[in-house]
Amino acid sequence: MNDLLIRFWRWFEIAPEQYSIEGAPQIYGHEEDDFPYFDQLLMCAQKIVDDNDLTEGAISDLLTVMAIDNESESVSEYIQENSSPKQLEQIVKIGIEHMQFNARWQLSEIIINRKPKGYFFYLDRLCHDDHPYVSSRAKSCMERVRNKTN
């Protein structure tokens, strides 16, 4: 997976650190899913979820691919539908601090749909995220949670 991610960053002509701040620049004339090995990235992400013994590095790679796949959200959906409660808790714990904002905002949706242990705490943390898009999406999710409980 790491080799594929390195190839992606070279192909997209952006450093992961820059992508974590700006997302996809509109000037390049291509989207993330135009990457020739995009389907392989998605398959690797699914394989990580299917693995029962997640490492911190594997989760970080999974979250990076989820960020890259932020338009179709297929990685996010796969996590929601296929991760065990234990895996989901690991993903969320690491994910709320992950460098890619496009992964963090998707976690808000995963959190309210699956409600892992301590979900309100994680959602609250995302509501106070430094990135405005993450905090906006998390606040929207928080409002949906509050409306369901009233």
Give the label of every model feature segment.
Residues 1-67:
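Intrinsically disordered, serine/threonine- and proline-rich low-complexity regions
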Residues 50-62, 83-97, 116-128, 148-150:
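Amphipathic alpha-helical scaffolding segments comprising HEAT/armadillo-like alpha-solenoid repeats
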Residues 59, 72-75, 104, 135:
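Residue-level detector of extended alpha-helical repeat arrays and alpha-solenoid scaffolds
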Residues 62-72, 96-100:
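HEAT-repeat alpha-solenoid elements in large eukaryotic scaffold proteins
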Residues 67-70, 80-84, 111-115, 142-146:
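Alpha-solenoid repeat junctions
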Residues 74, 91, 106, 122, ...:
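Alpha-solenoid helical repeat scaffolds
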Residues 97-99, 109, 113:
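Charged linear interaction tracts used for macromolecular binding and regulation
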Residues 99-100, 130-133:
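Short inter-helical turns and helix N-cap capping residues of alpha-solenoid HEAT/ARM repeat scaffolds
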